[in-house]
Amino acid sequence: MNRFIDLSEEVKSALEERRPVVALESTIISHGMPYPQNIETARALEEIVRENGAVPATIAIIGGKIKIGLNEEELEFMGTSKEILKASKRDLPVVLAKGLNAATTVSATMICANLAGIKVFVTGGIGGVHRGAEETFDISADLQELANTNVAVVCAGAKAILDLPRTLEYLETFGVPVIGFRTEEFPAFYTRESGLKVDYRVEDEVEAAKVIKTKWDLGLKGGILIANPIPEEYALDRAYIEKAIEEAIFEADRRGIRGKALTPFLLEKIKDLTEGKSLKANIELVKNNARVGAKIAVQLNKLYKEA
């Protein structure tokens, strides 16, 4: 195994025994949610993955080591320490070389999962093309990782703070299939609809797993995006959340907040503007993704064992 990687016993034995494993990111713990909801959600996600037949592997960097599968103490540390950096692809070599602590974004988690041989990764929403990117060029590294790294990503679409039409155009340019899980519409994180279409729809986990395996069997590199809408009962009203997003973006512009600080700032501001409703929605959508992601991992694992 790669010298930078430290597998938990649970994950190590699952990989050795060819059991299904699901990667989970840590940015949601350190930068995406406040304490204690962050730790509670992280534990709940792991439990949901187990209940649905797979082994959870929460990924983070602690002391310059890529930890794949965190224990209680490490989860607590990621959720409470103020010393946690946010590591994307470009940050990985520096964080590892300097022995630092960092939460992994979607792009970094995909890289780490791929190094460990984990094929399915569950997150809330991916990063993408930011609003105003035609001037700022602010485009998340998540999109390039989806173009290049063989990991299937289950999400509730892209984060609603982004420019969703341009995000989908970017994914199309780089040949990333955007598959709707029981939906024809690309979900917009807090809402089930965006007015934008996905490329294809699948009806169940078996179909999703077949598409994923077929892509890689063809030798086509890169990921697949499985867009799984937030459950109806937790979805927010589109006009209501859009108003909060626009206010938050205006405030970020006014304060000159850019780069990797932008997304955490916007999520926090939207939480305040919606009196916590956006946080509740965020927690529920990622739990739903964990359910679907674990089931897809189980089916994909079956297909690989049969091959």
From Swiss-Prot:
- Residue positions of the active site: 25, 159
Q: Which GO terms describe its cellular component?
A: cytoplasm
Record keyword Cell membrane present: no
A GO BP term here is: nucleobase catabolic process
Q: Which InterPro entries match?
A: Indigdn_synthA-like, PsuG
E.C. number, please?
Answer: 4.2.1.70
One Pfam family here: Indigoidine_A
Known cofactor(s):
Mn(2+)
Q: Which residues bind Mn(2+)?
A: 138
* Entry-linked SUPFAM superfamilies: Indigoidine synthase A-like
A GO molecular-function term, please? metal ion binding
Reactions catalysed, semicolon-separated, are: D-ribose 5-phosphate + uracil = psi-UMP + H2O
**Which note does the record give on the cofactor?**
Binds 1 Mn(2+) ion per subunit.
Ordered alphabetically, the record's keywords are: Glycosidase, Hydrolase, Lyase, Manganese, Metal-binding
**At the top level of its lineage, which domain of life is listed?**
Bacteria
Q: Which positions bind substrate?
A: 86, 106, 140-142
Q: Which family does it belong to?
A: Belongs to the pseudouridine-5'-phosphate glycosidase family.
Task: Briefly state the protein's biological role.
Answer: Catalyzes the reversible cleavage of pseudouridine 5'-phosphate (PsiMP) to ribose 5-phosphate and uracil. Functions biologically in the cleavage direction, as part of a pseudouridine degradation pathway.
Instruction: State what protein this is by name.
Output: Pseudouridine-5'-phosphate glycosidase
Source organism of the structure: Caldanaerobacter subterraneus subsp. tengcongensis (strain DSM 15242 / JCM 11007 / NBRC 100824 / MB4)
What's the name of its gene? psuG
